[in-house]
Amino acid sequence: MRHNVKGRKLNRTASHKSALLNSLTTSLLKYKRIRTTEAKAKEARTFVEKLITKAKKNDLHVKRQVMSLIHDKEVVKELFSEILPKIGERPGGYTRVIKLGSRMGDAAPMAILELVDYNDIANKKAEEHKEKKDLKAKAKADEKAKEQVEDANIIEEK
C-alpha cells in the first residue's frame, strides 16, 4: 500500500530518479524551457518549485544546498543573479507545464516545462520568424508587381 507516498516512481531506482530530476532542473534553469514527457515534467515542476522557493533565502547555506543538487556552477550563478531577481516577488508558481500531444515513436504524452516569466524568449523567436515571413512575402509581392509593370510596358510597345 502506498499510504502517504508522494511523487511518481518514473520506473527508476531512487538514485536514478534523483539524477534525472537534477538533470532536468539544470536544463530548465539553463535554457528556461525544456521538452520532456508529461510525467517527468510534472515531477520536475515540484522539484524546481521547491528549489526556487528555498533559493529565495539567498544565504550561503542555501547556495551550498543548491550546489549539491545542480552541479553546473554557471547555472547556479544564473539562478541567484538573474532568475531570482526576476521571479523573486512571486509567491509560487514559477513554472508551467504545457501539454503538447503524443511522441511519434512510442506515443508517450509530451509536454513543455518552462519558467513563467521567461516565455518572452519564445515569443521573441516567434516575432522574428513572423517578421522574416512578412519580409519574404513583401519581396515576393514587389517582384510580382515589377513583372506586371514590365508586361504592361511590353504590351504598350506593341
Give, region by region, the residue ranges found by the protein language model.
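Primary mode marks residue(s) on the alpha4-beta5-alpha5 output face of response regulator receiver
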Residues: E157-K158
